[in-house]
Amino acid sequence: MKRLIVGISGASGAIYGVRLLQILRDVDSVETHLVMSQAARQTLALETHFSLREVQALADVTHDARDIAASISSGSYPTAGMVILPCSIKTLSGIVHSYTDGLLTRAADVILKERRPLVLCVRETPLHIGHLRLMTQAAEIGAVIMPPVPAFYHLPQTLDDVINQTVNRVLDQFDIPLPHDLFVRWQGA
C-alpha cells in the first residue's frame, strides 16, 4: 500500500485538494495522510460548501498542522511522497528556506531530504520575480512545480472537468493508477 501525504495550504483552490481526497478514497492501494494549514481551513470555508469535518473524513489519517511529532514528520516513516494542492506562496517559501514552523512544511522538508516525490501545485497569479525564484529553488532541491493550470484539449464542459484533469495529472506524478481516467488524454492530432 502506498502512503501519500496530502497537504492543503491556504491558497485559493481548496477544492483541488478536496477532489484529490475524494478520488483517493476509492483507491484501496493508497492510504492518505491529510495535513491542512490554519489558512486552508479558512479558505475551505470561504470557497466550498464542505465542512472541515467532511474533508477530514475523506482522509485515512488526519494530522494536526501543529503536531510536529506526527508520524509524517520523520523520514523513518515510509511514504510514497507528498502533494500540496493548492500550495500557497507562503508554504512554498517555507519549504524552500527549510522554515518548518508546522507539520505542513516539516513533512515537505522530510520528503525532500529523503528524496521522495514532492509535488507543489502553486496557486498564484500574476507571479513576480520573487515567486519565480522560489519555484526555481524548489525545483532545484527536488520538488516538482505543477501549477493547477487547466488544459483544454480534452474539451472540458464543467468546472469539475477542469479540476479532475489536474487531479488526474497529479496522481500520474506518483504512478497511482485509477480504474478509469478522469479526463480524455491527448492521443495526437
Curated annotation (Swiss-Prot):
UniProt catalytic activity: dimethylallyl phosphate + FMNH2 = prenylated FMNH2 + phosphate
Superkingdom of origin organism: Bacteria
InterPro entries per record: Flavin_trans-like (IPR036551), Flavoprotein (IPR003382), UbiX-like (IPR004507)
Involved pathway(s): Cofactor biosynthesis; ubiquinone biosynthesis
Record's keyword annotation contains tRNA processing: no
GO molecular function, a single term: carboxy-lyase activity
Segment forming the signal sequence: none
Enzyme class: transferase
BP GO annotations: ubiquinone biosynthetic process
Residues that bind dimethylallyl phosphate: Y153, R169
Keywords: Flavoprotein, FMN, Prenyltransferase, Transferase
The protein's role, per its UniProt record: Flavin prenyltransferase that catalyzes the synthesis of the prenylated FMN cofactor (prenyl-FMN) for 4-hydroxy-3-polyprenylbenzoic acid decarboxylase UbiD. The prenyltransferase is metal-independent and links a dimethylallyl moiety from dimethylallyl monophosphate (DMAP) to the flavin N5 and C6 atoms of FMN.
Claim: Transit peptide is one of the keywords in the record: no
Enzyme Commission code: 2.5.1.129
Residues annotated as binding FMN: G10, A11, S12, S37, S88, I89, K90, T91, R123
Pfam families assigned: Flavoprotein (PF02441)
Name of the protein described by the UniProt record: Flavin prenyltransferase UbiX
Gene: ubiX
Family: Belongs to the UbiX/PAD1 family.
